[in-house]
Amino acid sequence: MTNRLLCAFLFIFGLLIHPPAVLPGQIIVDSEKQFQLAFQALEKGEYQRAVVEFERFIHFFPEDEKVPRARYLIGVCYLRGKRYETARKFLEEVYRAYYPKPVSGKALFLIGESYFRQGFPEEAAGFFKKVIETYPQPELKNAAIYRLGWSRMQKDKWQEASKTFNLVEKSSRLYPSASDLSDKALMGEDLPYKSPTTAGVLAIVPGLGHVYTDRYKDGMVALLLNGLTIWAAVEAFNQDLNVLGGVLVALELGWYSGNIYSAINGAHKYNRKVRADFRRNLTDSLNLNLFTSREVPLGLALKIDF
């Protein structure tokens, strides 16, 4: 009996000296689990939730080796969510904070990618060039060359684009696509083209400039509208309705100048559409998963009190 009491006493005393690691009202947050929770939200396309989870990770584990990557992936979330200016803000911070580490090179590339996706290929090209000049990592460098080729195609610089695609190394996974695009880029020089100047000159005869740009319906409308207005103005003056005639002449000047402007603008639209359709039918093989691949180092643990 005495032995049992002694054992019970020692057991209770041991609990008092070494309490449980987790007390009621506490949870353990593991750095690796927290990071993976954020990463899984990113993979599912839940970008705002992923941002919150990455920020929570950074807050609780500011010394963790994955903090640079977490900050970088916040920028990726905003990029994928098409919040390009916000993405650039975070990516620029990563670039400045961790230069010249590889994560800064990826951040610099994605700043260029944000401009490319926004439709600013000239601005994007500057960042891709900087990646090529600064970062020797083959995958990153070849991706920047590949995207620089696309940026030049967006500006209708077909020969420059072709030469750029040829710079992608044969060892790169992008090489087959780059080789194909190098040939197809040159086809852009042979795409149909409508001269805006010619369209404007032809529009001296109302509607003819529209016909030149294959806008036959608009050409017919322009011809009828201008023709009827001119006829009505002439009839008004013939019947001594000078005020009405003056109003009709003023209207016709507006219709006529609008007809010329519309024909010139139509030529520009035609050229843009033909080239955009051509580019749309080309295959872009750049996979941005290259920039969000998993890394699995061991993590720390942190207790949080409710």
Indicate residue ranges for each PLM-predicted region.
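Hydrophobic alpha-helical membrane-anchor/signal-helix detector
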Residues: 192-269
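Canonical tetratricopeptide repeat
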Residues: 70-73, 107-110, 147, 181
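Alpha-helical segment of the N-proximal tetratricopeptide repeat
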Residues: 30-61, 76, 80
